[in-house]
Amino acid sequence: MIKLYLTPNTRAGRVAWLLEELKIEYEVEILPFTKEGLKSPEHRSRHALGRVPVIEDGDVSIFESGAIIQYLLDKYDNKGLKPNAESKEYPYYLQWFHYCEGMVMPPMNQIVVQTILLPEERRDETVLKQAMNLLTKSLNPVNDYLEGKDYLIGNFSAADCMLGHSCYCLLYTSDAADDRNC
């Protein structure tokens, strides 16, 4: 059985979402967002930097949400959540699958750092405002592309899990920024 190590409100949500879509049985171990949870020697044996998500699938232990999702699709996709490489949808699937980590998550990470992770005295309003502006610019093409569509490539795919989860994370990221009047 697959074991998913996660901390709530992290990229591990993408992996859990895909596992649910694929109807794969899995076990969850929730690690607290603390030094004892993520930086423990036990967890660092799974991920040297003490990050999540990590899955264990038999002898395989793999981290990074995109890599995990690709692995799960290649091994277990029985729902067609990844188009065939020869299909006309495939290039767009790849584009949107990777867009979230390349364009959406970098400014979101800065917003989280500036509103949640850093102590108040180390936060920089200029960095926060720049990140908010970049995030808006990064989301505009997504909004435009999805106009009149339900999904990124016609039917629901793993690209929707990747990018959709990033958009879901905006709910708590935006709340943190709103609390600071950004």
Could you say what each language-model-derived stretch is?
Residues M1-K129, N133-T136:
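GST-like domain detector, emphasizing the conserved glutathione-binding G-site
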Residues L139-I153:
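Hydrophobic alpha-helical bundle segments that form small-molecule/ligand-binding pockets
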Residues P107-Q110, Y151-L171:
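GST superfamily/GST-like fold recognition
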